[in-house]
UniProtKB/Swiss-Prot annotation:
Location(s) in or outside the cell: Cell inner membrane
Disulfide bond positions: none
Membrane topology: Multi-pass membrane protein
Gene Ontology terms describing biological process: cysteine biosynthetic process; sulfate assimilation
GO cellular component terms, A-Z: plasma membrane
The name this protein goes by in its record: Sulfate transporter CysZ
Membrane-spanning intervals of the chain: 24-44, 69-89, 148-168, 214-234
Upper classification of the organism: Bacteria, Pseudomonadati, Pseudomonadota, Gammaproteobacteria, Pseudomonadales
Organism domain of life: Bacteria
Keywords assigned by UniProt, alphabetized: Amino-acid biosynthesis, Cell inner membrane, Cell membrane, Cysteine biosynthesis, Membrane, Sulfate transport, Transmembrane, Transmembrane helix, Transport
GO molecular function: high-affinity sulfate:proton symporter activity
Gene: cysZ
Length: 246
């Protein structure tokens, strides 16, 4: 199968989740994500101005005109942090369903079924493994995010925090979603990261378009399962199974 560009993988993923046989595996995580989104956005709307004021540096009177220039950067920074939080929480909650969705997408793409049939018992059995994998992602994400968060409070340096958050976010989108098919095939965490680095530009292309799509409220709810499907197609087309051969 020929490789695609990053945007094409997400677009094809969106088409795949519309197939009748995959809708059940989309509907459950979609409902969970909707609940998480409603709760988080409600809280963020109440605290938004406070968070922006907290991050904004204090400027002397003679530089007060710069406030109108840097303020949009800090608004964007808060939006990026809220986005990260929603994505992280939603993916932890939906992880077992996303793993099953990835399996079923791979069956459709390859035209053969190498996975156990769906059952609620099988889903429950997946929870410890998928939760463990999500905790591994969290352990990868949090130290790096903490460094960026500290930079966000350092005057002067915090001006570059927003673009660094965005670049990190793009990479994390590739890690987050391509890990589902990798984990289904029992590819180790470090091996998965090494494989992604070997496909760095393709991963950044997929991660970039996914990042942009997930920034759009409500649209992001549909794009999360589309990203799972697109990442699974990425795994198949970019020959991820070769990473399993040592």
């Amino acid at each position: 199968m020929p490789a695609l560009s990053g945007p094409q993988y997400l677009g094809e993923g969106l088409k795949l989740i519309m197939r009748p046989g995959l809708r059940l595996f989309v509907l459950i995580p979609l409902t969970l994500n909707l609940l998480v989104f409603a709760l988080l956005i409600g809280f963020a709307m109440q605290q938004f101005s406070h968070w922006v004021d907290l991050l904004m540096p204090s400027l002397p009177d003679w530089l007060s005109f710069l406030q109108y220039i840097v303020w949009p950067l800090f608004v964007l920074l808060v939006l990026v942090i809220v986005f990260f939080t929603f994505t992280m929480v939603a993916n932890i909650i939906s992880a077992p369903f996303n793993g099953f969705l990835s399996e079923k997408v791979e069956v459709v793409v390859r035209g053969r079924d190498d996975f156990p049939p769906f059952s609620w018992a099988e889903l429950l059995a997946m929870i410890p493994r998928t939760m463990g994998r999500e905790m591994r992602k969290l352990a990868y994400f949090l130290p790096r995010a903490l460094v960026l968060l500290v930079l966000s409070f350092v005057p002067g340096v915090n001006l570059i925090a927003t673009p660094l958050w965005i670049l990190f976010g793009i990479w994390m989108m590739a890690v987050q979603y391509i890990d589902y098919p990798a984990d289904n095939h029992k590819l180790g965490w470090n091996e998965m990261l090494a494989w992604l680095r070997s496909k760095r530009w393709a991963c950044m292309g997929f991660g970039g378009v996914t990042y942009l799509a997930l920034l759009i409220p409500l649209v992001n709810l549909v794009m999360m399962p589309a990203a799972v499907a697109g990442a699974t197609l990425f795994w198949v087309r970019e020959e991820g199974e070769k990473a399993l051969v040592k």
